[in-house]
Amino acid sequence: MIQMQTQLEVADNTGARRVMCIKVLGGSKRRYATVGDIIKVSIKDAAPRGRVKKGDVYNAVVVRTAKGVRRPDGSLIKFDGNAAVLLNNKLEPIGTRIFGPVTRELRTERFMKIVSLAPEVL
C-alpha cells in the first residue's frame, strides 16, 4: 500500500535509487496505490551519471509492495520492500533493465514490456 510521502526503491537502470510518491493517480480522493497502479514520483537519490537526476518528477508503476497482493486462490505475495519502475509520459519504461521479481498482476496490455524485461515473474 503506497500513499503520498512513501519512499520506494527503483527497480530499473535509469540511475535513480530512491523515489518518493507525491501523488496516487486515478481519482481525486484516491489514497492508496498497490501493485500495477501508476503514481507520480520525485527522485530523492540518483547515481551521478544516470538518465535521471535528483528532483525530477516522473510517472512510475508500483511493481513490489511490502503489504502484498492477494490472489483469487487466497494466496498472498509479499516482498521485503516497496519498489517502482519509472515511466515516461507515454507510460513506457525509461530503463532498459528491471531488477528483482515482479508479480503476475502486471501482465496487462499496458505493462507487458516490464514483465518481459523482469528476471522473474511471481
Curated annotation (Swiss-Prot):
Q: Which InterPro entries match?
A: Ribosomal_uL14 (IPR000218), Ribosomal_uL14_bac-type (IPR005745), Ribosomal_uL14_CS (IPR019972), Ribosomal_uL14_sf (IPR036853)
Q: Which keywords does this chain's UniProt record carry?
A: Ribonucleoprotein, Ribosomal protein, RNA-binding, rRNA-binding
State the superkingdom.
Answer: Bacteria
Q: Which PROSITE patterns match?
A: RIBOSOMAL_L14 (PS00049)
Pfam families from the xrefs? Ribosomal_L14 (PF00238)
**Gene3D superfamilies this protein is in?**
Ribosomal protein L14
Alphabetically, the GO molecular function entries are: large ribosomal subunit rRNA binding; structural constituent of ribosome
GO cellular component terms attached to this protein's record: cytosolic large ribosomal subunit
GO BP annotations, alphabetical order: translation
Q: Which family does it belong to?
A: Belongs to the universal ribosomal protein uL14 family.
- Note the subunit structure: Part of the 50S ribosomal subunit. Forms a cluster with proteins L3 and L19. In the 70S ribosome, L14 and L19 interact and together make contacts with the 16S rRNA in bridges B5 and B8.
What is this protein's function?
Answer: Binds to 23S rRNA. Forms part of two intersubunit bridges in the 70S ribosome.
What protein name does the entry list? Large ribosomal subunit protein uL14
* Annotated organism of origin: Laribacter hongkongensis (strain HLHK9)
Its gene?
Answer: rplN
